[in-house]
Amino acid sequence: MEKAFRPHFFNHGKPDANPKEKKNCHWCQIRSFATHAQLPISIVNREDDAFLNPNFRFIDHSIIGKNVPVADQSFRVGCSCASDEECMYSTCQCLDEMAPDSDEEADPYTRKKRFAYYSQGAKKGLLRDRVLQSQEPIYECHQGCACSKDCPNRVVERGRTVPLQIFRTKDRGWGVKCPVNIKRGQFVDRYLGEIITSEEADRRRAESTIARRKDVYLFALDKFSDPDSLDPLLAGQPLEVDGEYMSGPTRFINHSCDPNMAIFARVGDHADKHIHDLALFAIKDIPKGTELTFDYVNGLTGLESDAHDPSKISEMTKCLCGTAKCRGYLW
């Protein structure tokens, strides 16, 4: 497969190359990313002759869909910290909703850290154990802040941290692995896609030939949803991210009942809580070449009882993760 694309690259680099064909080329889409030279994405198939869906498009940021409400500019605000170091402490406005640190890693002075990441030593830049275990939301600084792009509280904003390889598995379609070691607590990448309304998500489910299959690619942005919220953007039905036809490499990550990564809600500008990022962090050390996985249905209950109900089992989707902790069914 890799050899077959060498002339493909060459032809797309010619002045008379077909622009439409180049635009729809997965390899050209990947090569256009600013991070490609340092953190390349590769596609490898050593199992069969399958190719990625030609209708799929690689993107490096989520796309806001039709009728998706966005916060008014007057509600947007960033921190006014005098230095990047200030963005680790309770005085940083971006961290107002983070719980103060209370472990042995806390600042030795009077100020308490609310910062989600370790700030020094071998764990610098990794997600703190407290946050990793609780899966509480992560609040970061952003482009509207006074701090620099090197601020230690802009981990997710700076983007993917490792090269990734999309590969063909023996029995689960495409999967993703990393050619370098990943540390526990390390940010890997975001789950990207088209951000759509709940009504549009339901319409797409209804139009899908296999509704349950569509759910594999739809993720609700419901971390902050609250029908009693005074913020109308949070009181309504949550938006959803559809990664089926436009996404990044994480779209191809498979499910596991014993995963090595987990999704965290990451907030930049607090006015954008309803369209928060879905950030993937390693929850254990991941040796290079290991398939990356996360739990598609983390927190879902009732699967075991449904699996023993003859009226429901025929509609359930079998899990193929093959781990010792496999629940038997995805949903």
From Swiss-Prot:
GO cellular component, one term: chromosome
EC numbers, comma separated: 2.1.1.355
Binding site for Zn(2+) 3: C87, C141, C147, C151
Residue(s) at site: Interacts with H3S10: T209
Residues at which Zn(2+) 1 binds: C79, C81, C87, C92
GO molecular function term, any single one: histone H3K9 trimethyltransferase activity
Signal sequence, renumbered to the chain: none
Effect of R251H: Reduces enzyme activity by over 99%
Swiss-Prot/TrEMBL domain comment: In the pre-SET domain, Cys residues bind 3 zinc ions that are arranged in a triangular cluster; some of these Cys residues contribute to the binding of two zinc ions within the cluster.
Protein name per its UniProtKB record: Histone-lysine N-methyltransferase, H3 lysine-9 specific dim-5
Organism the protein comes from: Neurospora crassa (strain ATCC 24698 / 74-OR23-1A / CBS 708.71 / DSM 1257 / FGSC 987)
